[in-house]
Regions:
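Flexible, polar/acidic helix-loop-strand segments at domain edges
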Residues: 24, 273-379
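Acidic, glycine-rich segments characteristic of secretory precursors and extracytoplasmic regions
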Residues: 1-11, 26, 33, 40, ...
Length: 503
């Protein structure tokens, strides 16, 4: 997740474009094939995690622990991670040959691809086991803060019920929905059954200083490193850091940059709070020129980026035409979420975005590929929003109404509340609350909106997915691009594996 998986999730969506290898899956072109490394690496590493988790599940009881609760916590973590990687394989690649037991020989890696319903059941069973074994909030102390808790298992279980209810009626053979089950899992978290979670200052969810805060339910832990910045997914040191290549600011060099599509920028500009000011969440989501008249600043408010500088410090012309890559010029904003602003700059000249010397790779930060911002995969805000969605779609009302849960998220950002909500309200709010966090593509997938959304933007936005070139983006193809291709190595080594349609 520090490399291909997170960037692929973001850049496959309609939110942003990049010009790195990580962006290729989101270009939907002929270069996206089953041998491309950003397809192969997540697939292999996710299965590797499933194997390791299975070994722990089957062997941890053989180890003597002074504390039974600690043994249960470790076993619960293993169940959780095995569930999570299978869940992510299922929503990304669709065809999954689950690892139900620890492989003992090469033959054990040749497994039958099971029906999606069976895989969902396996994932949910693992999460139930995890939930019953894992500790509640507050158990982990010191260096262990941030490890998996029962609330994370409950939240992911609810998320699986919600995703299954959307995906399978559209792409599978079952029309059964699980909105009651989803709402019930989320409601237990809202009630405080696993400890108290709350909404914090929005910006705290995307920085280093406030990691593992009271809003964090499932947070992947990363550690910035200014010395060891080389990134090889699967190696010991690489797993410690978040690789920002493919999400960096315009001017950091082709292969590193990303831009935000105008529709997302415009959505935030149109979102005004109760005081008539620009939605505060915009300032933690993207880098943009906040001195434009259309941006309604609060007294003393300014957007700050790397080194504490402002947009005009990096881009004196007021837009991206200040830097060398002409393909960035038409866009209004760039990605901010995921960037570690605590990392030191190599020099104090913010206009020297592309290094301190000809031919160097010493961009904005000391090293751009070893950032330390944790990836908050499930926040309490997401639990509230998913609960509201499950209830709107027919799930049983728990301790809050759908509108009450929805309004809690809105109120945190000083936005107006609603007396009743619809799915359109939820879709709009998820854009503003969770932009560029890796959920948008899968939201569109489970709502059945992917193809229509991409076709609409292909017609209305001449710069949509054009950061690499005018021709790399070949258009979203329905009944193909919902899923990533199965890697060639899997097709060649597993007789039961078949390629996804269209590849």
């Amino acid at each position: 997740f520090g490399a291909s998986a997170s960037k692929t999730a973001i850049l496959r969506s309609d939110e942003a474009s990049g010009n790195s290898d990580y962006a290729k899956p989101g270009m939907y072109g002929s270069s996206l094939n089953s041998s491309f490394y950003t397809i192969m690496q997540p697939f292999g590493l996710l299965y590797s995690t499933a194997s390791q988790a299975s070994y722990v599940i089957e062997n941890v009881d053989k180890v003597t622990f002074p504390d039974e609760a600690l043994k249960n916590a470790y076993k619960g973590e293993a169940y959780f991670w095995r569930a999570f990687v299978h869940y992510y394989l299922l929503i990304s690649y669709r065809q999954v040959a689950p690892i139900r037991h620890a492989p003992e020989s090469a033959a054990d890696y040749v497994r039958v691809v099971e029906a999606p319903g069976a895989v969902w059941d396996f994932i949910i069973d693992d999460l139930e086991n995890a939930k019953n074994l894992l500790p509640h909030k507050g158990y982990w102390k010191g260096v262990n803060v941030g490890r998996i808790t029962a609330a994370a298992a409950a939240a992911l279980k609810g998320k699986c019920y919600l995703y299954r209810s959307g995906i399978e009626p559209l792409y599978g053979e079952s029309t059964k929905t699980y909105y009651d089950e989803a709402a019930a899992e989320f409601n237990e978290i809202i009630k405080g059954s696993y400890g108290g979670y709350s909404l914090v200052e929005y910006s705290w969810n995307f920085d280093v200083a406030h990691e593992n805060n009271d809003e964090s339910i499932f947070e992947m832990q990363f550690l910035g490193d200014v010395e060891n910045a080389s990134f090889n997914p699967g190696t010991a040191t690489s797993g410690l850091a978040f690789d920002t290549r493919g999400l960096m600011l315009p001017g950091t060099g082709v292969g590193y940059e990303a831009v935000v599509h105008d529709w997302l920028y415009d959505a935030f500009v149109s979102s005004l709070d109760n005081d008539g000011k620009t939605d505060n969440r915009m300032f933690s989501t993207m880098i943009f020129n906040d001195l434009k008249a259309e941006i309604k600043l609060r007294k003393g408010q300014r957007l700050t980026g790397p080194g504490g500088y402002h947009f005009e410090d990096y881009y004196p012309k007021g837009d991206f035409s200040s830097v060398g890559n002409t393909r960035t010029y038409p866009y209004k904003a760039a990605v901010l979420k995921g960037l570690d602003l605590s990392m030191p700059m190599r020099n104090n000249d913010p206009t020297s975005l592309n290094g301190v010397g000809a031919g160097t790779k010493e961009y904005i930060y000391n090293q751009p590929r070893a950032h330390g911002v944790n990836w908050r995969y499930i926040r309490y805000a997401d639990v509230l929003m998913m609960y509201a969605e499950a209830v709107v779609l027919g799930g049983k009302v728990g301790s809050l109404s759908a509108a009450q849960a929805f309004n809690k998220v809105r109120e945190r950002s000083n936005m107006s509340t609603k007396g009743a909500i619809t799915m359109e309200d939820i879709k709009s709010e998820r854009i503003l609350e969770f932009a560029l966090e890796g959920h948008r593509f899968f939201d569109l997938l489970r709502w059945g909106d992917l193809a229509s959304r991409f076709k609409s933007l292909e017609k209305s936005d001449p710069n949509f997915k054009k950061l690499i070139s005018d021709t790399d983006y070949e258009g979203f193809t329905e009944n193909k691009h919902e899923w990533l291709p199965i890697p060639i190595a899997e097709l060649e080594s597993n007789e039961y594996a078949k390629q996804n349609p269209g590849y």
